[in-house]
Design a protein with these regions (language model features):
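C-terminal scaffold of the Radical SAM
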Residues: 1-167
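Single conserved hydrophobic/aromatic residue that forms the stacking wall/gate
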Residues: 170-180
Length: 180
């Protein structure tokens, strides 16, 4: 834990405007996986991982950082606008090869093939990979709204939920019954 605290202190000392915290995922096909598999590296126990996370958040808060999203903290005014749009169920347009978008109720990606991308641009058509288009039922979209909204420290607004899905409060009474 001392090494972790020292690392967080060094990060805070550098005063970046934004800090992201992610737990290491040991995945097959990576160098870390090989080290782990060969017994040359240990995985951090889940309880210790959570302690490290909460310790870092406390240290960052003390240094003036605001924990605004499950894995991000920022100095006031430096929150990631893209992340907040995503977690707030706002539309966004991805530009470039393989970029993701959410617009008009659909989720889609641009082609990641340069030739197809350039051809589409020259022909003035969207460079969307047609196989990537995802349209969900309203019930599924409601679940996505809740799930992504819960990534934010403030959670999500039922008023915003009602507005997005044009639902009256009676339709969301089930959601409210699950509040702590």
């Amino acid at each position: 834990m001392k090494m972790w605290k020292d690392t967080v202190r060094q990060c805070i000392f550098l005063k970046p405007a934004h800090i992201s915290l992610y737990s290491l995922q040991i995945e097959e096909g990576t160098e870390f996986y090989e080290l782990y598999k060969d017994g040359k590296m240990e995985a951090v126990p889940e309880i210790q991982d959570r302690e490290m996370y909460h310790q870092a958040l406390a240290m960052m808060k003390e240094a003036g950082y605001m924990h605004y999203e499950i894995s991000n903290a920022a100095l006031p005014g430096f929150e990631s606008r893209h992340n907040l749009k995503y977690w707030s169920y706002a539309e966004y347009l991805g530009l470039g090869l393989g970029a993701s978008s959410f617009a008009g109720g659909s989720r889609f990606k641009n082609t990641s093939r340069m030739h197809e991308y350039l051809t589409a641009i020259r022909e003035h058509v969207p460079p969307v990979d047609q196989e990537s288009i995802e349209n969900y039922s309203q019930r599924e979209e409601m679940g996505i709204f809740v799930f992504t909204g819960l990534r934010k420290a403030e959670g999500f607004s039922l008023d915003h939920f009602h507005h997005v899905f044009r639902r009256s409060e009676e339709h969301t009474s089930e959601l409210q019954s699950h509040e702590p």
